[in-house]
Amino acid sequence: MPNAVRYTIEVAPSASADFRFVHLTDTHIMAGGRWRPRAGDFEFDTEASLRRVIETVRALDPVPAFAVFGGDLASPDLLDRGRALTAEEYEPSYRLLAEIVAGLPCPAHFLVGNHDHRVAFNRVLRPKAPAPDAPQYYSFDHARYHFVVLDSQEPGQAAGLLDATQLRWLRTDLAEHARQPTLVFVHHHPWPLGLEWIDSMSLRNGDALMAALGEHPDVRWVICGHVHLDQASQRGRLTMLTTPSTCIQLSKVTQAPKMLPGPPAFRIVDVAGEQLSTRVIHLHGAAGRDV
């Protein structure tokens, strides 16, 4: 049975039906290749690990109402670090991702991360995007809960940024959904985790995001990817959760980058009455091998 770590908080009373969703992140799909990280003496099959995660999600009872993919969806750039890849070179990885995700028993929502290519992402996963390189931010409701998907990609940078237009949209959206329990998804973590080399790649204007969220007491959780770690921290009434990757993980006991060959993982969030609870599922027996 996979290992699970649970973290629970109370939210405002709800008359809505119980439901669950899953957060999967940093899938790093690279069609036709295996990830061989610089900070690790191994190679890893990110496709195989994601397929294992999807099979585990398919077996969940109850079935999730939806899945959220937290960014860094496709990463063929990690196979060819010497140059910037074109949209056409990214597209096979997004098509492979789409084929794998089609096995889910529920709808999927997608965030953009720093390794993603917006044009290729939009062509494959968001064909009705208003422009070829349009950012991916929006909100949706399920039961009486409100969910916000943000786009923190700053092209060409490992760190993230929310531009003024997106922050204005966020404030308007939250104001229009006041008194709804709200969860926010963003790829980059908005406040430090305490590891300098990871925090150097965080959301550069995290304080601006926190200021916007702080105006709305019904915003409870911010759920992030990017760091390949299972972390939970609190600032005032806001809880930030980071979800491990569906493939390679990062060590949180070193002050320099160190990558580990799994185990693949994902997060379950259960909504039951007045309570939100979450746990991270780790799938042992990773799809990596020494080289």
Spans of features found by a protein language model:
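Generic enzyme active-site microenvironment
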Residues: L24, F69-G71, L111, F185, ...
